[in-house]
Amino acid sequence: MSIKSDKWIRRMAQEHGMIEPFVERQVRGEGADRVISFGVSSYGYDVRCADEFKVFTNINSATVDPKNFDEKSFVDIKSDVCIIPPNSFALARTVEYFRIPRNVLTICLGKSTYARCGIIVNVTPLEPEWEGHVTLEFSNTTTLPAKIYANEGVAQMLFLESDEECEVSYKDRGGKYQGQRGVTLPRT
């Protein structure tokens, strides 16, 4: 597998709709305002977080069960910022909608700006022929509230191209998160 460059990412986004909306350069500021960078980088794409958040709460004293997840465990927030309570987490989604080629696996890594503040981003790999908005999980590992900014960079996608296509893709399997839009909770 080889990692793909900015030229390949740009071509796949523009000719095949791999990333929509697509920002073909790295944005570090908007006017006089500084932002956490997003858009194409040398060997990746820095995604933005949309303004839809689900913040974990324990007001119902529920047990977290991935096979029977209770939606009431979250408070929905639509805002330019999200405050995550200490030692808690929030879900969000990317602004970008992805269409992953059949011979590509995409890995997501958190941005150092957030990591250096104790905020960890977790996303499982985007499998061959998966498409949708990426659901992002932000863990606040600190003892203080932590802030996430909507419409700014939160993570980087790395695209790894295989030397041969897989026999069965995510789409072929009928993956349960295929075509997801918005913030998507656990499914079984």
Curated annotation (Swiss-Prot):
Q: What is its EC number?
A: 3.5.4.13
Is Hydrolase set as a keyword in this record?
A: yes
GO terms (BP aspect): dUMP biosynthetic process; dUTP biosynthetic process; nucleobase-containing small molecule interconversion
Pathway(s) annotated for this protein in UniProt:
Pyrimidine metabolism; dUMP biosynthesis; dUMP from dCTP (dUTP route): step 1/2
Q: Name one Pfam family in it.
A: DCD
| One GO molecular-function entry | nucleotide binding
Keywords associated with the record: Hydrolase, Nucleotide metabolism, Nucleotide-binding
Catalytic activity annotation: dCTP + H2O + H(+) = dUTP + NH4(+)
Fetch the InterPro entries from UniProt: dCTP_deaminase (IPR011962), dUTPase-like_sf (IPR036157), dUTPase_trimeric (IPR033704)
Family in the record: Belongs to the dCTP deaminase family.
**What does the UniProt function comment say about this protein?**
Catalyzes the deamination of dCTP to dUTP.
Write down the PANTHER family for this protein, in alphabetical order.
Answer: DCTP DEAMINASE
Q: Which NCBIfam families match?
A: dCTP_deam (TIGR02274)
Complexes and interactors: Homotrimer.
Q: What is this protein called?
A: dCTP deaminase
Organism encoding this protein: Pseudomonas savastanoi pv. phaseolicola (strain 1448A / Race 6)
